[in-house]
């Protein structure tokens, strides 16, 4: 009887330790555990028939996302950081939006990077709103840390439009990824001036530089 009670206590203790580590039944809870090494997953949002947000003058989010993501990849690989892209062309990753998002999350979870960064563009009904915004999963300490670092770097581009990193618990990628992940909204396509910036190669270089610098600071 004593032996059974002792075994039960040991089992309960181990279960408690697993919960504290953010692991249950062999799976990390969303955004709770950092991956190993210096592998980064870059996720260029949307693609294919899913153009994402449309700019005031017709700019398509999917194209801007991919161009900026490829620039970030180039900067990171030049510094010896391994990068996996969820997409490197204009193709969608699934027949439906849900299937597409599931595949992106599957890649993140399978590769288990130290950080996954999903690149997007924003839009809002108020045409005057502009500036980059970084989101993280609300319950992820690692995600919060990464988001704050990236937000700080992006705020340097134009301090007038500085923002704070925001927690979110509803975005599919944020709540289903088992690794630290952030969503970077580089700017607002609903703002005419920012749309013009976001389609320019020079400004894309600037944004890519800020994001890659933030990633490197997070890794360090």
Where in this protein do the model-derived segments appear?
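Hydrophobic membrane-insertion alpha-helices, especially the h-region
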Residues: 1-15
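Catalytic-core regions of hydrolytic enzymes
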Residues: 22-40, 46-148
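Hydrophobic/aromatic residues positioned on beta-strands within the core alpha/beta folds
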Residues: 43-44, 186
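Peptidoglycan cell-wall recognition and remodeling modules
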Residues: 50-54, 92-93, 158, 162-164, ...
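Sec-exported extracytoplasmic/periplasmic mature domains
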Residues: 70-81, 109-113, 151-159, 203, ...
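Conserved beta-strand segments of alpha/beta enzyme cores
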Residues: 82, 161-164, 180
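Active-site-adjacent mobile loop/cap segments within catalytic or ligand-binding domains
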Residues: 111, 125, 167-220
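Active-site-adjacent substrate-binding region
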Residues: 143-165
